[in-house]
């Protein structure tokens, strides 16, 4: 009877260890896969992300918003001309050279406005180039080696049946946590790209104010917002990279149960930091 009980216990332990390792191997695979997916997503330009949406946004910007921006630029240029005339004692002390300066300034403003879409895309091309360069470093440093899982399996073999059962249930719970994390990351990454499209669609309006000293703050803040949203992808990538490196310690900590709960803690921390990436990026670029 004792031999049968021991055999059943060993069989259950083997079954639980196999289940735990299966859950954790899937967990590690999810981490590595998610890092790779985010590297691709945040490193994709608006034009390459979705050609259909990009074409729609470009048409809206050029056919609907640009005429409104043209009216705003006309108002700004006329206002500056009137202001320049009144400042010189109703043209009694007016310098003809100021007219040439005004013409040159207005011409530059028209040129910038007519190329607004290309300028906005150039901002994102710069940020995506930086992100793509960093992605190669990040994905190369977050691989989980088989040796780590082997060390964890050796630790599990020394545990009792009850502890293994509790650990199995916890490892099962962590898989659902990872699914929630994947959905959350999906919302953050895709939400950022939608925000980029929204900013791009209205780009001509703030750009039309750049040439004016009083109204130019709108355009300057808009450009800062573009850089902030662009480089938010870099912060997202850094957050996930830090998370993946921290997760590597789960297989070498010597305490499987503590490692499982540590993984949950890291997951919650990642979710919190992903929510903060937009705020941090805007504070860096002084955008509001």
Where are the regions a protein language model picked out?
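Alpha-helical transmembrane segments of helical membrane proteins, especially in multi-pass transport
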Residues: 174, 178-210, 224-246
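Membrane-embedded alpha-helices of multi-pass transport/permease systems
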Residues: 75, 120, 127, 184-187, ...
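Membrane-water interface regions at transmembrane-helix termini and the short interhelical loops
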Residues: 81-94, 182-186, 214-215
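Hydrophobic alpha-helical transmembrane segments
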Residues: 67-79, 196
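Gly/Ser-rich, low-complexity
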Residues: 1-72, 88-97, 107-177, 216-221, ...
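Elongated alpha-helical scaffolds
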Residues: 102-105
């Amino acid at each position: 009877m004792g031999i049968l009980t021991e055999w059943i216990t060993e069989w259950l332990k083997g079954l639980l260890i196999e289940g735990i390792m299966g859950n954790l191997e899937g967990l590690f695979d999810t981490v590595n896969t998610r890092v790779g997916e985010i590297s691709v997503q945040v490193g994709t330009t608006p034009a390459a992300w979705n050609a259909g949406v990009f074409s729609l946004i470009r048409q809206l910007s050029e056919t609907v918003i640009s005429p409104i921006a043209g009216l705003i630029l006309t108002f700004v240029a006329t206002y500056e001309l009137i202001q320049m005339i009144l400042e010189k004692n109703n043209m009694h002390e007016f310098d003809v050279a100021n007219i040439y300066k005004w013409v040159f300034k207005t011409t530059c403003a028209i040129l910038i406005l007519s190329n607004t879409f290309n300028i906005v895309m150039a901002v994102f091309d710069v940020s995506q180039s930086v992100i793509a360069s960093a992605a190669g470093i990040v994905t190369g440093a977050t691989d989980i080696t088989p040796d780590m899982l082997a060390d964890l399996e050796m630790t599990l073999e020394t545990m009792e049946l009850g502890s293994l059962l509790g650990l199995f249930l916890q490892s099962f719970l962590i898989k659902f946590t990872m699914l929630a994390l994947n959905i959350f990351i999906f919302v953050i990454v895709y939400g950022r790209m939608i925000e980029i499209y929204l900013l791009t669609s209205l780009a001509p309006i703030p750009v039309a104010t750049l040439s004016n000293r009083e109204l130019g703050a709108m355009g300057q803040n808009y450009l800062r917002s573009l850089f902030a949203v662009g480089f938010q992808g870099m912060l997202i990538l850094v957050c996930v990279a830090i998370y993946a490196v921290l997760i590597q310690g789960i297989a070498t900590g010597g305490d499987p149960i503590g490692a499982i709960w540590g993984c949950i803690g890291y997951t919650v921390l990642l979710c919190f930091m992903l929510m903060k990436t937009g705020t941090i990026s805007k504070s860096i670029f002084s955008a509001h």
